[in-house]
């Protein structure tokens, strides 16, 4: 994650999102697979567009693998994005075993977001973090403060904040936490700033804000909160924000 030198302007990493389903770029509302918007046929076009607008990294999501469908449905698209841009790529969705971890790292993915398996088998996740230091990110997706799993199709009884605290006590090798408030995702209503503040207080693991980042004011507020990073999705696709301005406001230049 980014470091900030004394006296410098706050800097927040921006991760433009590309969600993939059947090899195409899409967006879901609140993780609902029946509320899908498809943005053309070729995700590489968006990857190049974000790069030309100032993106220094990309956040990719395999929606097919996330809910247990074919783990290979989007593999070709991921590889083409990496080859076309050369940008560091963070990827989530269906990362539930070491074979998948090794396969995606070999394709060129920089780091992987692990959600469901991290919650259900924290011993395994800690082991993988220690085996692949700095390569694994805990994906904590919350609905009403509880961790959701299986592509957001199931909600557990585990508090998102307690889960983050326990992870930090087990290993120093987690790269980051991507924290998503499902109620905010794709709704264009702003992030859950209160939840983000609670999560930041629960752990010193670098936090990536995800879900509902919609306006330039949202970006400014996240910077003021000293949020290390943010994922921006639908607002870019819908033209509500220009990535170049988002990057400028975040100081990610």
Swiss-Prot record:
<feature type="active site" description="Proton acceptor">
    <location>
        <position position="19"/>
    </location>
</feature>
<protein>
    <recommendedName>
        <fullName>1-(5-phosphoribosyl)-5-[(5-phosphoribosylamino)methylideneamino] imidazole-4-carboxamide isomerase</fullName>
        <ecNumber>5.3.1.16</ecNumber>
    </recommendedName>
</protein>
<dbReference type="GO" id="GO:0005737">
    <property type="term" value="C:cytoplasm"/>
</dbReference>
<dbReference type="InterPro" id="IPR013785">
    <property type="entry name" value="Aldolase_TIM"/>
</dbReference>
<dbReference type="InterPro" id="IPR006063">
    <property type="entry name" value="HisA_bact_arch"/>
</dbReference>
<keyword id="KW-0368">Histidine biosynthesis</keyword>
<dbReference type="InterPro" id="IPR011060">
    <property type="entry name" value="RibuloseP-bd_barrel"/>
</dbReference>
<comment type="similarity">
    <text>Belongs to the HisA/HisF family.</text>
</comment>
<dbReference type="InterPro" id="IPR023016">
    <property type="entry name" value="Isoase_HisA-like_bact"/>
</dbReference>
<keyword id="KW-0413">Isomerase</keyword>
<dbReference type="GO" id="GO:0003949">
    <property type="term" value="F:1-(5-phosphoribosyl)-5-[(5-phosphoribosylamino)methylideneamino]imidazole-4-carboxamide isomerase activity"/>
</dbReference>
<dbReference type="InterPro" id="IPR006062">
    <property type="entry name" value="His_biosynth"/>
</dbReference>
<dbReference type="Pfam" id="PF00977">
    <property type="entry name" value="His_biosynth"/>
</dbReference>
<keyword id="KW-0028">Amino-acid biosynthesis</keyword>
<keyword id="KW-0963">Cytoplasm</keyword>
<feature type="active site" description="Proton donor">
    <location>
        <position position="141"/>
    </location>
</feature>
<dbReference type="GO" id="GO:0000105">
    <property type="term" value="P:L-histidine biosynthetic process"/>
</dbReference>
<dbReference type="InterPro" id="IPR044524">
    <property type="entry name" value="Isoase_HisA-like"/>
</dbReference>
<comment type="pathway">
    <text>Amino-acid biosynthesis; L-histidine biosynthesis; L-histidine from 5-phospho-alpha-D-ribose 1-diphosphate: step 4/9.</text>
</comment>
């Amino acid at each position: 994650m980014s470091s900030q030198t004394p006296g410098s302007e706050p800097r927040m990493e921006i991760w433009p999102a590309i969600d993939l389903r059947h090899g195409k770029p899409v967006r879901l509302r609140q993780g609902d697979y029946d509320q899908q918007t498809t943005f053309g046929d070729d995700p590489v076009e968006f990857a190049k567009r974000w790069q030309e607008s100032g993106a220094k990294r990309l956040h990719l999501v395999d929606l097919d693998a996330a809910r247990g469908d074919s783990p290979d449905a989007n593999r070709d698209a991921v590889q083409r994005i990496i080859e076309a841009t050369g940008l560091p790529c963070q990827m989530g969705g269906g990362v539930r075993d070491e074979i998948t971890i090794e396969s995606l790292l070999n394709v060129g993915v920089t780091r992987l977001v692990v959600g469901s398996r991290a919650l259900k088998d924290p011993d395994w996740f800690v082991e993988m973090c220690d085996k692949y230091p700095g390569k694994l990110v805990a994906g904590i997706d919350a609905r009403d403060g509880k961790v959701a799993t299986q592509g957001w199709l199931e909600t557990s009884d585990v508090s998102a904040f307690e889960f983050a605290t326990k992870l930090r006590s087990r290993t120093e090798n987690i790269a980051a936490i991507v924290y998503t408030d499902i109620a905010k995702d794709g709704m264009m209503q702003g992030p859950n700033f209160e939840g983000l503040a609670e999560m930041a207080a629960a752990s010193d693991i670098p936090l990536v804000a995800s879900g509902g980042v919609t306006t330039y004011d949202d970006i400014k507020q996240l910077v003021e909160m000293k949020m290390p990073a943010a994922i921006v999705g639908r607002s870019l696709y819908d033209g509500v924000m220009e990535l170049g301005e988002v990057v400028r406001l975040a100081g990610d230049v």
